[in-house]
Amino acid sequence: MQKKAVILYSGGLDSTTCLAIAKEQGFAPYALSFSYGQRHQQELEVAKLNARPMGAVDHLLVEFDLRKMGGSALTSDIEVPKEGVGEEIPVTYVPARNTIFLSFALGWAETLDCFDIFIGVNALDYSGYPDCRPEFISAYETMANLATKAGVEGKRLKIHTPLISLTKAEIIQKGLSLGVDYSKTHSCYDPAEDGAACGRCDSCRLRLKGFAEAGVTDPVKYQKL
């Protein structure tokens, strides 16, 4: 019987590649997306349209509103920076977001009798978010195996991070080798009303840099700069 895996799936470049990798590795992917009050709602529309065509057995959308807390340019009226990736943790960091996301994934995994979770975090070409680092993932996996019925019963849960040591160009090349259609992904933090990417936020800059280094044209629509 095919093993199940919960895939954190935003509709972005990394999570879409992650879903394709899970499928390549023989897992039956269960896609998990979140509507958390993010300003870039277009990613959810992409996720809804593409989860099942990408091979997801099921696609669950969980809704909660982090705008009530604020603290991030993605969940409040703070302006999204357009001046490139700096050294400090940027204002686009959403406090504890991956901890929250992984906790929902952990709960769904237990419900599904599933012991594998995939998350598309990356520690090379990234914005410096603390919850994308290997040490965070390792600590969370340890906690998950202490905090769940499955873990206590000896059914070890594993958090897979297949992109964590890849450059953005390598991620794109891997996805293309698996047939990922990157025109059906969304990365921009501050898109136009028609969905066109801004081309200037951290996420757009990292994406464009990755495509350039991979020698491939990014197929998504960008605003005229």
Swiss-Prot record:
Originating organism: Citrifermentans bemidjiense (strain ATCC BAA-1014 / DSM 16622 / JCM 12645 / Bem)
Nucleus keyword on record: no
One Pfam short name: QueC
Cofactors named for this entry: Zn(2+)
Top-rank taxon, per record: Bacteria
E.C. number: 6.3.4.20
Residues that, per the record, bind Zn(2+): 188, 198, 201, 204
Pathway it works in: Purine metabolism; 7-cyano-7-deazaguanine biosynthesis
GO biological process: queuosine biosynthetic process
Residues binding ATP: 9-19
Function of the protein: Catalyzes the ATP-dependent conversion of 7-carboxy-7-deazaguanine (CDG) to 7-cyano-7-deazaguanine (preQ(0)).
Gene that encodes it: queC
Record's catalysed reaction(s): 7-carboxy-7-deazaguanine + NH4(+) + ATP = 7-cyano-7-deazaguanine + ADP + phosphate + H2O + H(+)
GO molecular function, one term: ATP binding
Signal sequence coordinates: none
Name of the protein this chain belongs to: 7-cyano-7-deazaguanine synthase
UniProt keywords, alphabetically: ATP-binding, Ligase, Metal-binding, Nucleotide-binding, Queuosine biosynthesis, Zinc
